[in-house]
Amino acid sequence: MMDPAAGSGPDGAAVMPPELPALPVAAEDPMALYRQVLRDFKELFFCLEPMEITRYVHRNEGRCLSLGPPKGWHVMLRTEDGIITAAKQAASKLICCREPLTPLGYAVILLPEPRRDHHDGMVATPYVVFMGRFSRVYAYDTREKYMVLVSHNLDELARYGVSRSEIAYRDVIHTTLRRMTVPVPRRYPKGARTMHVLFLNDTTPEGSYATAERILGCDVKLHTPGYGTVIMRLMKTVQQLHRIWPFCALTEVESRRWWWAVRANLATPWYVLGVTGRPRPGRSFVAEVLVLLDWFGAVYAIQMDDPNHYVRRVANTITEFFRMGLLKMVFRHRRFERERQRQTRMEHRHLCPHHHERAVDHKRDILFNEDAALPDERRERERRILQQQYDWLCLTERFDPHEGAWERLDPNTLVLHRYDTNSQSYVLDPDIVGVEAAEREAAGHQDDTGPRLHCLVTTRSSTREGAERVITALVHQSRLVTYSDPFPLKSLTGVREYIQI
């Protein structure tokens, strides 16, 4: 991909981007990023037409605007080049309605000051950032040819940034970050146990693994950014699943129907990784989400309380899964791609973000006096109302200086959700999901050595080299290793895209 930091002016002369802005080193102020996004996008917020946005990008080419959390994500303003033009054409075909998408530039990650050197002050990404109506922000992946809705409006962008989007957790991004920065060891609480999850078969010659904090036995913590931490119980076989609810209530015929449906949906050999849920003292573990891997390492999930039990992809790799958890289930319906590609990848279908805009446009026509004889009067009124809205966004009384957004003050409040998130889902409290109770129980079992390595492997390999392929360092750290072989794929007649379980 072309370096987003370089560009050319209208006369063909090279345009050098301004010096990269300094990132805040300290994190004492939890609202610093929120205010930074509001400041950076202020002029764009008042742009009434796509051409105004384009002129702003031309005037400020090379400037970096903050995209909010995670810290470091910015959009570097760039006028249209070949890549951006192609991305704009592709994105316009993916969007569900006729919404004008104006390119802002490339998404980049600025490195903190201590980690920058003379040449590498940022990490380029394959994402082109667009702005739509009502300050909606989209990002188009030029490699995998899909687009995600980053935020519905400026307020959501300032609060959550790209933390609700899958683009922030891709392996390609984090691999580049590790290569360009000083490695920082992951810190776990004092006395914490860890579990390595290893995936290894003929499709992954080098193998891949992720590390999770282990609670007790095969229970590990799975964190979903913006949602919370839940308990995930790693499983090896279907027989182990029959010990937990609701699988323990299935008859043999119903169980066979389940696994046949999973096999038909994935169309490859597959592994059981485990289930998320909550333990019940003296009773069966309650499974809420079943997590599977296909032969190529992609991670899928089945929501148990969904009557259709659709199999949906939640991550491309096991490392991405333990990095973003169930993000694509909690904040779903934000991905736009070709229908055939969506069906092949088994992604959630997007929901139209323009659902309520007809009523909004009607109210705007009333407020902005569309019937006014002078168009300048209408534009002046529109800018005045936008200024009032922007001033409201900047009110400090909307937030608590220590807790962040005002709705976080009430632990029983509903998650701030739209129609594309899980409706009526309460803010995850550790006591509700059983994390704190499990930690208290684990504290009483300090002598627990338990499994340290969970392997998803092919023990039968066609080559000697494959049979001897092992990550030795992980095995030596392990007091007890568990193995999970893939379930075999039996040929099916015909093509069945989606089979309800």
Swiss-Prot record:
GO terms for cellular component: viral tegument. It is found in: Virion tegument. Disulfide bonds: none annotated. Its main location: virion. Signal peptide: none annotated. Keywords: Virion, Virion tegument. This is Tegument protein US24. The lineage of its organism: Viruses, Duplodnaviria, Heunggongvirae, Peploviricota, Herviviricetes. The gene is US24.
